[in-house]
Amino acid sequence: MKLNLITLVVLLIVADLTLLFLPQPLLLPWQVALVIALVLIFLFIFLRRNFLVSLAFFVASLGYFHYSALSLSQQAQNITAQKQVVTFKIQEILHQQDYQTLIATATLENNLQEQRIFLNWKAKEVPQLSEIWQAEISLRSLSARLNFGGFDRQQWYFSKGITAVGTVKSAVKIADVSSLRAEKLQQVKKQTEGLSLQGLLIALAFGERAWLDKTTWSIYQQTNTAHLIAISGLHIGLAMGIGFCLARVVQVFFPTRFIHPYFPLVFGVLFALIYAYLAGFSVPTFRAISALVFVLFIQIMRRHYSPIQFFTLVVGFLLFCDPLMPLSVSFWLSCGAVGCLLLWYRYVPFSLFQWKNRPFSPKVRWIFSLFHLQFGLLLFFTPLQLFLFNGLSLSGFLANFMAVPIYSFLLVPLILFAVFTNGTMFSWQLANKLAEGITGLISVFQGNWLTVSFNLALGLTALCAGIFMLIIWNIYREPEISSSNWQIKRAKFFTLNLSKPLLKNERINVLRCSFGIILLCFTILLFKQLSKPTWQVDTLDVGQGLATLIVKNGKGILYDTGSSWRGGSMAELEILPYLQREGIVLEKLILSHDDNDHAGGASTILKAYPNVELITPSRKNYGENYRTFCTAGRDWHWQGLHFQILSPHNVVTRADNSHSCVILVDDGKNSVLLTGDAEAKNEQIFARTLGKIDVLQVGHHGSKTSTSEYLLSQVRPDVAIISSGRWNPWKFPHYSVMERLHRYKSAVENTAVSGQVRVNFFQDRLEIQQARTKFSPWYARVIGLSKE
């Protein structure tokens, strides 16, 4: 292997990316990495093989990056669930409406270093940035729900450097640590008070989205323009450009001998640094400003690199500065966007296109170049968006085409002017009017969000790769060009300037890579189809609640919906996204009973699927269109499966635990018993006629009032699934239930530990899958379990 800077940086990047998938036991301690690297260097001295140096560098990089993960993981592991008086400083406010969620720094014990804590707080006095408080906090270890393909909150915690979660019980402010940024933020809040889009203006000025209302945020999310609100590369680049232009204007008044080409560059970076400071040097902001400073440094050093090499160096530098950056979705969005544009402009530059063999006029060129840029992002960035967000906005192309120029050249400069001039010349009011206009304009495209399943995402990715193949083949399909000025006419009006054609080998490599992506997508689809079970039962991780999904042939029956609360539900957070990711068509909804932890999301599910049949043991109205009652003796066949209702015997006005709808599902060979929260006295009745079953949904989340000795002696389940929340106040599952299940040699799966549990039924066997296993990445493991 030939040694050069780019090669070493690529090895550095690969070493850091191992943090995305390696489980905790495979992380390499820095001491071990150092020993291995020294041994490899020693071997190099004798063998003189360059690959040994590369390997030593790679191992040393592993030690450096893995140390960050191991250190943070150990801090999180040391947290014990307890109440503690803590003095903390507010670093970031995430949400500030009826309640506050924020990130603070604190020293939890005298012998520990300062840690970052995620806090939930319903404060009487609104907390502000940089304030120091002393509070009684109910601390606990990091934990999160985990469903297949869903959002991993633990990954988000670690990406933010958070090692503990707490709820503030009571607090007293003990100090105001004033900073210029905090003072400026309070000043701007007063200046913009009463403006309709105050939250948006503050977000664009300071990177603080705590005051951004849900309606506005929803508009930008559903139109693929949310990136305009997060201060990142686009905004820092704009600040750099503004500073550069201001410096050029100032240079007009300089004597010629004082005019230097580096002055505008340095001034632009300083201006960008000021904006980054106002934004609190958030992760996206830090990433952007670090990249900018690094590129400027390379320019000053007069080193020449291609755009792709520049990009590689910048990514390596960023990862070296923050090893946990790959855990952040924003990192992949930022790097993905830049990488997509580099590829697009490398192989399909706008300079290719002309009008009747002549360059476009400046105005036309500006408009068409925007179309060209947006189309490139649409083609390259769509696959990344599909896999990260499970969908895309059908009108996002047009929304960005209109919003990006207005934000870039009008709104952001106007907001910066307002910040630095304290709102002179009614600049805040003008910025608010402009923000209202563009928000109203793009809101026309709201509602065009298309949710995409994983399989469809693979198909669309293959389609994008195929379109790119056709573009490359169509543009460069002619024989080698003998004259550098030869123009090839392709249409009546638009022509192509191929004065700089792709080399044949490079063109072939691009086509091969595109075809490889297509082949990979269809291989994954084929593998999924061939390994598809006959039917499956999914117990979703919905915390302290229940949501079980029976799936066959892409159709589903949902048994319970988890809980709900003011402003949200598990149906919105977990169940609907899972159905959409998997492309499952819901046909029936069964509610075991009316308690919130089982039926809280019923209205949300029925709103999303208005044509499903609702089966319930009570007369309670959930706004359904078609309802039947759950009564013992009723049965039906669905997709070749037999459903038999065992309990209750009567319909009631409101169903509680004892009225739970108990259902036996079987395919003639395998059987599943769904018990809801049925109590032991109910089990004495419906278990009389039951024989051995394969899977038991353990009643009442593992409470000692259910899963009686009698039931287990009758059904003797091979697999017992408990749906519970890790921090539930009743400490379910009860030890007596666990003891009984183990005595009957049942394999016990608890969603509080395993996350989502899936049981796949094949013709000759059943197979259990967990969202969280011992092979899960280090950040997804159960943390602090040994201390409970």
Curated annotation (Swiss-Prot):
The keyword Cell membrane applies. One of its GO terms (cellular component) is plasma membrane. It comes from Haemophilus influenzae (strain ATCC 51907 / DSM 11121 / KW20 / Rd). It holds the Pfam family Competence. Keywords: Cell inner membrane, Cell membrane, Competence, Membrane, Transmembrane, Transmembrane helix, Transport. Gene3D superfamilies: Ribonuclease Z/Hydroxyacylglutathione hydrolase-like (3.60.15.10). The chain crosses the membrane at residues 3-23, 27-47, 51-71, 226-246, 263-283, 313-333, 367-387, 401-421, 434-454, 456-476, 508-528. Might contribute to transformation as a member of a membrane-bound pore complex at the base of the transformasome. It could directly interact with transforming DNA during translocation indirectly by participating in the assembly of the pore. It is a multi-pass membrane protein. Signal peptide: none annotated. GO terms for biological process: establishment of competence for transformation. This is Recombination protein 2. It is found in: Cell inner membrane.
